[in-house]
């Protein structure tokens, strides 16, 4: 299975040749937010978790006009196993503000789990709704008669959304492939073909290894690759965890930023986790701002009965 992991990573990175920006919310602590990228992750860890993220990108960014500011993103999610059915269920809501454009999505995921080899293979689907809102009052066209910007106020449109994925995890490694926005959805805010904004399909590949050099120390390298088949981006990083209680790490986002991460687990069962990520922008600081900040909180609910055996987590810090 390790060979399969390596081959899949190489094919994904080599086969995608153009690296540019793309349409997707961005998270530095991606290893704690797997459900967002892949519906097949629903219920895989065998415990019910509640997770919340808040991200402020390019903090302190000053726009040329008005008070649009930088990008800010919030996500809340529920991830729960359905042990008697060998399956899992997930819910998440994402709010992504990008200047005059706001993306809001609400999604429900279901995954079925199969024992394969020494691990678990999960197949998942996701259905939901994706909303885009354009605030025309924030646009300042060079040409006042530009037909693309003749709207007034805030205009919203809602479209159905569908995603699917596959996820495999064993005791010491995991890998998943998610396929997002599989329905061909178009947002047409002017009512004609002059301002089409399609919801583009994305492929996301995630993976990681769990290595314990000592009894209390765990090292977990991981990666995230995203593509719309025209462009791609990748994150690669490593976390070090001590005594299942505190962690720290670094990651690199291609042509974008260097990230530092810290976190701490509270209570006897380590059920409450608080994490923080700091991004330092590496390129084009004159057009952005130098830093971004991200906060993560996750809480694992107690097991409901003695028969609900917790599944071995891989890596164990993930939620």
Language model region names:
Residues 4-15:
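Sec-dependent N-terminal signal peptides
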Residues 1-6, 116:
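Positively charged n-region of N-terminal signal peptides that target proteins for export
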């Amino acid at each position: 299975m390790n060979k399969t992991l390596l081959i899949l990573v190489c094919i994904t990175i080599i086969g995608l040749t153009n690296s540019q920006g793309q349409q997707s919310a961005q998270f530095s602590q991606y290893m704690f937010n797997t459900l967002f990228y892949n519906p097949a992750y629903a219920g895989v860890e065998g415990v019910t978790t509640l997770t919340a993220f808040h991200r402020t990108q390019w903090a302190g960014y000053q726009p040329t006009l008005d008070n649009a500011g930088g990008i800010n993103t919030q996500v809340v999610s529920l991830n729960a196993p359905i042990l008697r059915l060998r399956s899992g269920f997930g819910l998440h809501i994402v709010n992504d503000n990008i200047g005059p454009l706001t993306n809001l999505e609400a999604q429900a995921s279901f995954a079925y789990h199969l024992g394969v080899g020494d691990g678990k293979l999960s197949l998942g689907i996701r259905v939901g709704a994706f909303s885009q809102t354009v605030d025309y009052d924030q646009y300042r066209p060079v040409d006042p008669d530009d037909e693309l910007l003749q709207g007034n106020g805030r205009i919203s449109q809602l479209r159905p959304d569908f995603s699917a994925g596959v996820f495999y995890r064993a005791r010491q490694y995991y890998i998943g492939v998610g396929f997002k926005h599989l329905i061909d959805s178009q947002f047409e805010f002017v009512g004609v073909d002059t301002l089409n904004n399609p919801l583009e399909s994305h492929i996301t590949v995630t993976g990681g290894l769990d290595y314990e050099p000592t009894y209390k120390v765990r090292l977990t390298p991981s990666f995230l690759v995203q593509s719309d088949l025209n462009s791609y981006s990748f994150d690669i990083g490593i976390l070090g965890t001590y005594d299942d209680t505190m962690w720290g790490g670094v990651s690199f986002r291609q042509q974008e930023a260097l990230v530092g991460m810290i976190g701490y687990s509270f209570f006897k069962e380590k059920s409450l986790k608080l994490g923080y990520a700091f991004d330092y922008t590496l390129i084009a600081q004159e057009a952005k701002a130098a830093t971004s900040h991200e906060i993560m909180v996750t809480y694992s609910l107690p097991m409901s009965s003695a028969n609900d055996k917790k599944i071995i987590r891989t890596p164990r810090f993930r939620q």
